[in-house]
Amino acid sequence: MIQQETRLHVADNTGAKELLAIRVLGGSKRRYAGIGDVIVASVKDAIPGGSVKKGDVVKAVVVRTVKEHRRVDGSYIKFDENAAVILGSGREPKGTRIFGPVGRELRDKRFMKIVSLAPEVI
């Protein structure tokens, strides 16, 4: 459950290390984002020489949340950290690698490139 001002780890190799959520996309009154939702975020920490710099405003998709997410079959999924993948043009990831597991909800929301790059889909 991601909301405004939430800090997230970055799960790709774009060079960013930490994001700060600015807005949850999808409606004017939308408050929370879960796995597979797109947010607008600011890069708060980045490594030198990366494709994104500190202070850049980017779109990102949430791939892991600490708050449990209920699935249709009644099971719950939760992770140890909040993490996101930075998006480039369209719904494609800006980086070429994804680190750590991602939720199966990304497949339902048609982020196929992220699902194929991820080492594990839970």
Swiss-Prot record:
Keywords: Ribonucleoprotein, Ribosomal protein, RNA-binding, rRNA-binding. CDD domains: Ribosomal_uL14. GO terms for biological process: translation. Gene3D superfamilies: Ribosomal protein L14. InterPro entries: Ribosomal_uL14, Ribosomal_uL14_bac-type, Ribosomal_uL14_CS, Ribosomal_uL14_sf. GO terms for cellular component: cytosolic large ribosomal subunit. SUPFAM superfamilies: Ribosomal protein L14. The keyword Flavoprotein does not apply. GO terms for molecular function: large ribosomal subunit rRNA binding; structural constituent of ribosome. Binds to 23S rRNA. Forms part of two intersubunit bridges in the 70S ribosome. Part of the 50S ribosomal subunit. Forms a cluster with proteins L3 and L19. In the 70S ribosome, L14 and L19 interact and together make contacts with the 16S rRNA in bridges B5 and B8. Belongs to the universal ribosomal protein uL14 family. This is Large ribosomal subunit protein uL14. The lineage of its organism: Bacteria, Bacillati, Actinomycetota, Actinomycetes, Bifidobacteriales.
